[in-house]
Amino acid sequence: MAKYVIGPDVAIHLAHDEAVTRDDHQILAPALLRSQLLSLLYQAVHRGEMTHKDAERRLSYVRGLRIRLLGDRVLHSVAWKVADQLGWPDTFDAEYVALTQLQADALITLDR
């Protein structure tokens, strides 16, 4: 089974396209995905990029996806090391990298 870590940008994209994941793929994310997703959708509504109803629909869709959310001590420890090694100002992105290192085959992001 292929395991993929996704960030909130990809989660929103999946919801927008109403994508269906394959049975032989597992989606993973740090537990902080929920708060980041909520914040991104709120910001999009606040900027007038989507309606509150659209944001709720996307949030509901993502909640229905089979995403394994993780946030244990080992993940946090590795995220700290990743952020420190790369000189990042926080550990948010490092949690996604750490989870990929620990449990996944790839990190999927829309970042360029």
Task: Cite the ranges covered by each PLM segment.
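Residues in soluble alpha-helical coiled-coils and helical-bundle/repeat scaffolds
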Residues: 46-49, 70, 87, 91
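Acidic, metal-associated active-site segment
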Residues: 90-106
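Short amphipathic alpha-helical interaction patches enriched in hydrophobic/aromatic residues
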Residues: 41, 45, 66, 83-86, ...
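Short beta-strand scaffold positions
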Residues: 6, 29, 70, 91-94, ...
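Short beta->alpha linker loops
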Residues: 32-33, 74, 95
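Acidic catalytic patch
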Residues: 54-87
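Short, well-structured N-terminal submotif of metal-dependent ribonuclease cores
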Residues: 1-34, 44-57
